[in-house]
């Protein structure tokens, strides 16, 4: 918000030792996910359960009695933290001592953050006993809101993931309220890093005609498809295929960043129902398949094939289609327009003429709006385009050695995007009316500085409100316990250009918070304000759209001189376990009001 005074906070749980600094760092950088170790929604689904041994299971010889008494049943665990601890301990116990990685937080020294999401942060780290660098994903289990059974099953399934094109899982353990997942760290970064360095090496003028050549693209995509084939044959969906999640090792190995748990926790037993896949709306949906956006009938592994098609465009042009637009506009463009092509990013005719028919055919087939018409990973590997692919040595030469002198480009927490407004169409549906997209990232450093200033503003305290004070919102009038006007508000009339508002919503600790902010018509957008609330962790990421829509409703009421001063609405994030939605107490609901 350009001129808003955002106030409010959420209670945070302090972690010990290195995790404390890590958690603080992640909270300050939770706006978007652009790093190579993306932490929003990665792999979902499970392996075929026939190949997995469940925790605490018993075994007998066929046709005979067991040779030894069966082990006692596993202890009953009643929280995600206890479940994660039990599952992780069971996995470690199955390993030979020589293969075991340390499972104490003190054995690792966390370094820089390389990926930030709504419920987790990925760090580079140093394993002291093994004298080895690793990647550690720190997942806040309280925010995951997953069941005990899901957590136990998915940690075990993740440990069984073993493929040369998937990042290796080492171990996992509990550190305070967090689950730490230790994985291999690939030291050459992601394909997003490579794209940025390539653009810097050849210059923006040359890069506008294509960033990577077809041979490099074919080699990279072939390895990605091998990893996806492995996922899909084992009943998994990755859901976050993009350049930032495709990693490169110094020997030319391509691996998919599979940080498992935050994505695995989003579904259970292959259940791809609407309720289980809501989490896909975290982050910019440039790579998201239409059926995932619609959230009507669920989706299957063909969603990854769509993302692969977007990845192909990204590797060629340097960016995904619609990357300059706000998330809501990306949703609209993807759903309403024809599928993107290589020319979607073009600004002139024949801009990408260097790319041939076989490459464009691959993109076209991947980006079929009907999932049934998209080929499988196994079928794609037979496409003629991949005959152009080379071996790992080629990638070492073209993507590592040739770019060795180019400095690594720092990741910004988010790109500058176009502004716009939510408007209601003739049928009463909400649509995003955008201004013009940004043409350059040259101001990104200034943007980051401005963002830091806004984050400091957002650290102002929120006032805790009693449950009884939430009554009255259902009628649409001012609630009897509605937040009081700011001091001095009765003496002066605020500028008509600016509206003072307050959002009353429960935090993760289920306490009612009043989050005060202002809306300036000439400077703010409702989508931008909602995004800032998510960034400051004042509202759940799943509530971004619904908060923006109701904020626009209230603004419309104010502009029409309506007497209505408050709106109560249901939240997409729902309620916690053992809670019942209650509009009166704002359990599963929120209330937005105008201040006098």
UniProtKB/Swiss-Prot annotation:
GO biological process, one term: epithelial tube morphogenesis
Protein's cellular compartments: Cytoplasm; Nucleus
List of residues that carry Phosphoserine: 190, 405, 419
Residues with PTM Phosphothreonine: 13, 32, 280
Family, per entry: Belongs to the protein kinase superfamily. STE Ser/Thr protein kinase family. STE20 subfamily.
Role this protein plays: Plays a role in osmotic stress responses by regulating ion homeostasis and by controlling cell volume via the phosphorylation-mediated inhibition of the chloride channel clh-3. In addition, increases gpdh-1 translation upon osmotic stress, likely downstream of wnk-1. Involved in several developmental processes including the tubular formation of the excretory canals, the formation of the intestine and the progression through larval stages. In addition, required for germ line development by controlling meiosis and chromosomal segregation during spermatogenesis.
Organism encoding this protein: Caenorhabditis elegans
Biased composition (Pro residues): 67-77
Top-level taxon of the source organism: Eukaryota
Region annotation (Disordered) ranges: 1-80, 429-496
Biased composition (Low complexity): 1-54
InterPro entries membership: Kinase-like_dom_sf, Kinase_OSR1/WNK_CCT, Prot_kinase_dom, Protein_kinase_ATP_BS, STE20/SPS1-PAK
Consequence recorded when altering residue 137 to R/M: Loss of activity
Record-annotated membrane-spanning stretches: none
Name the UniProt record assigns to this protein: Germinal center kinase 3
Stretches with biased composition (Gly residues): 466-479
E.C. no: 2.7.11.1
Molecular function GO labels: ATP binding; protein kinase binding; protein serine kinase activity; protein serine/threonine kinase activity
SUPFAM superfamilies the UniProt entry points to: Protein kinase-like (PK-like)
Domain called Protein kinase: residue spans: 108-386
Biased composition (Acidic residues): 432-450
Posttranslational modification: Phosphorylated at Thr-280 and Ser-419 probably by wnk-1; phosphorylation results in weak activation. Predominantly autophosphorylated at Thr-32 and Ser-190 and weakly autophosphorylated at Thr-13 and Ser-405 in vitro.
């Amino acid at each position: 918000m350009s001129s808003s005074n955002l106030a409010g906070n959420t209670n945070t749980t302090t972690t010990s030792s290195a995790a404390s600094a890590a958690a603080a760092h992640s909270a300050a950088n939770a706006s978007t996910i652009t790093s190579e170790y993306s932490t929003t929604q990665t792999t979902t689904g499970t392996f075929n359960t026939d190949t997995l041994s469940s925790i605490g299971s018993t075994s007998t010889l066929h046709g005979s009695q067991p040779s030894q008494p069966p082990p006692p049943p596993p202890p009953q665990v009643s929280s995600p933290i206890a479940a994660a601890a039990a599952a992780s301990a069971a996995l470690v116990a199955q390993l030979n001592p020589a293969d075991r990685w340390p499972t104490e937080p003190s054995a690792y020294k966390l370094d820089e953050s390389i990926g930030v999401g709504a419920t987790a942060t990925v760090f580079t780290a140093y394993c002291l006993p093994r004298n080895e660098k690793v990647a550690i994903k720190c997942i806040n289990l309280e925010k995951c809101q997953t069941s005990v059974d899901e957590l136990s099953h998915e940690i075990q399934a993740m440990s069984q993931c073993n493929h040369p094109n998937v990042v290796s899982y080492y171990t996992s353990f509990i550190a305070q309220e967090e689950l730490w997942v230790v994985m291999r760290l690939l030291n050459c970064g992601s394909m997003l890093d490579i794209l940025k360095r390539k653009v810097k090496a050849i210059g923006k003028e040359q890069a506008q005609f294509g960033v990577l050549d077809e041979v490099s693209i074919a080699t990279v995509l072939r390895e990605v498809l091998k990893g996806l084939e492995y996922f899909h044959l084992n009943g998994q969906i990755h859901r976050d295929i993009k350049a930032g999640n495709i990693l490169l090792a110094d020997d030319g190995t391509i691996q998919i960043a599979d940080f498992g748990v935050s994505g695995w926790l989003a579904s259970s037993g292959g259940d791809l129902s609407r309720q289980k896949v809501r989490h896909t709306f975290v982050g910019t949906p440039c790579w998201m398949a239409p059926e995932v956006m619609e959230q009507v009938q669920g989706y299957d592994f063909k969603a990854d094939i769509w993302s692969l098609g977007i990845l192909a465009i990204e590797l060629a042009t340097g960016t995904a289609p619609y990357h300059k637009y706000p998330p809501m506009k990306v949703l609209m463009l993807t759903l309403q327009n024809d599928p993107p092509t290589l020319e979607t990013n073009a600004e002139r005719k024949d801009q990408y003429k260097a790319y041939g028919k076989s490459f464009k055919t691959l993109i076209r087939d991947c980006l079929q709006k009907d999932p049934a018409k998209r080929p499988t990973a196994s079928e794609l590997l037979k496409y003629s385009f991949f005959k152009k692919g080379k071996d790992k040595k080629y990638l070492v030469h073209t993507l590592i050695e040739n770019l060795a002198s180019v400095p690594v480009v720092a990741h910004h927490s988010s790109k500058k995007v176009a502004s716009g407004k939510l408007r209601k169409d003739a049928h009463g549906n909400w649509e995003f009316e955008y201004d013009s997209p940004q043409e350059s990232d040259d101001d990104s450093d200034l943007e980051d500085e401005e963002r830091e200033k806004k984050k400091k503003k957002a650290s102002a305290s929120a006032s805790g409100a009693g449950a009884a004070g939430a009554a009255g919102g259902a009628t649409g009038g001012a609630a009897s316990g509605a937040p009081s006007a700011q001091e001095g508000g009765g003496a002066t009339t605020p500028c008509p250009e600016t509206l003072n508002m307050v959002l009353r919503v429960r935090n993760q600790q289920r306490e009612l918070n009043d989050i005060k902010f202002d809306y300036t018509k000439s400077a703010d957008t409702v989508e931008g304000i909602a995004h800032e609330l998510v960034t400051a962790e004042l509202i759940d990421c799943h509530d971004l759209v619904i908060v923006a829509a109701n904020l626009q409703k209230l603004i419309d009421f104010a502009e029409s001189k309506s007497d209505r001063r408050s709106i109560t609405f249901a939240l997409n994030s729902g309620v916690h376990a053992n809670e019942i939605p209650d509009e009166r107490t704002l359990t599963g609901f929120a209330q937005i009001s105008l201040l006098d």
